[in-house]
Amino acid sequence: MGELDLLKPTIERTLNGTIQFGRIAMKPGKPTTFATIPTPNGTKQIFALPGNPASALVTFHLFVLPALRKASGLENPTLPIAKVSLAQDVKLDPRPEYHRVYISVTKEGGLTAVSTGGQRSSRVGSLRGANGLLALPSAKDTGIHSLKKGELVDAMIIGRLGGI
């Protein structure tokens, strides 16, 4: 939270809410906040997403969309996860990372993932064509600094798959 961010103090002091979490050890999306607010009709949920476009997209798919799907009564509120083969080497970050990719079906029926390019939170271009999010482990936790082309990685499907 920046020094000019008034959302958390407003939730706590003005709305008598509880911040359930205010920072997440992940990339992108570190400043994501989730809070609950008591109302006469029950507890209301508030998600505050980061301001950078890529961070907002990733945290929406990871947190907000599953919450909306659950509130709608869906039996399985999470988006599908599939094993995908990396089309190129991928460097790991010290934090767990959700890397934007384009996933397509291979001639053999497998899935392959191609990075959409630079993954900085502010890079809107990395959103273009992204239909998946690689769930990359932390380099700090694993002691591994990169994953190699051809390795299988879990990916969340966030759009229609492409074909080769």
Explain the meaning of each model-derived region.
Residues 1-4:
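ATP/NTP phosphate-donor binding region
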Residues 10-164:
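Flexible glycine/proline-rich
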